[in-house]
Swiss-Prot record:
Keywords: Membrane, Transmembrane, Transmembrane helix. The keyword Transcription does not apply. The keyword Transmembrane helix applies. It is a multi-pass membrane protein. Belongs to the AIM11 family. It is found in: Membrane. Its main location: membrane. GO terms for cellular component: membrane; mitochondrion. The gene is AIM11. InterPro entries: AIM11 (IPR038814). The chain crosses the membrane at residues 17-34, 67-89. The lineage of its organism: Eukaryota, Fungi, Dikarya, Ascomycota, Saccharomycotina. It comes from Saccharomyces cerevisiae (strain JAY291) (Baker's yeast). This is Altered inheritance of mitochondria protein 11.
Length: 138
C-alpha cells in the first residue's frame, strides 16, 4: 500500500511538471509575441531620420517570424490544455486516455484488441526487436 502511494505521488508530480512546463512555455511565447508586436507597431524616427520613409525590412523574415510565433503559441496553448486535462483526470498514458474516453462515452471496454499480424509483418517486427535488443546489450 505504501508503494502504491509513492507511485501515485510520483505520477502526480510528473503530471504536474508536464503541465507547468507547458504553461511556462506558453507564457514565455506570449511574452515574446507581445514584445515583437510592440517593436513592429511603432516606428518613431530619431532626430536626423526621415519620417516619411519606412525602415527596410524583409517580407520573408517577417513571414517566418510570424509563422514561428504562431506555431509556438498554438503548440504551447494546446499542450497546456492537454496536460491540464490529463492531470485533472489522472491520465498518464495513451492507453489510459482511451480507457477514460470510452468510459466517459459509455462504450464497452475492449480488453483484448485485435493485434493479429500477417506473416511478413510479424517477421519484420521480430527482426526489429532482435536488432534493438542486440544494440541494448552492447
Amino acid at each position: 500500500m505504501i508503494e502504491e502511494k509513492k507511485e501515485l505521488k510520483k505520477r502526480r508530480v510528473l503530471q504536474m511538471a508536464r503541465f507547468y512546463g507547458a504553461a511556462a512555455f506558453t507564457l514565455i511565447t506570449m511574452r515574446l509575441i507581445s514584445r515583437a508586436i510592440k517593436v513592429r507597431k511603432c516606428n518613431v524616427p530619431s532626430i536626423f531620420q526621415q519620417n516619411y520613409k519606412l525602415p527596410p525590412f524583409s517580407q520573408r523574415n517577417e513571414a517566418m517570424s510570424a509563422l514561428t510565433y504562431a506555431s509556438a503559441a498554438s503548440i504551447g496553448t494546446f499542450s497546456t490544455l492537454i496536460f491540464g486535462f490529463c492531470w485533472a483526470l489522472d491520465i498518464s498514458t495513451a492507453r489510459e486516455f482511451v480507457f477514460k474516453t470510452r468510459e466517459f462515452m459509455s462504450l464497452p471496454q475492449a480488453l483484448e484488441t485485435d493485434t493479429s499480424m500477417d506473416e511478413e509483418t510479424s517477421k519484420l517486427t521480430k527482426q526489429l526487436q532482435d536488432l534493438l535488443s542486440s544494440e541494448n546489450n552492447k
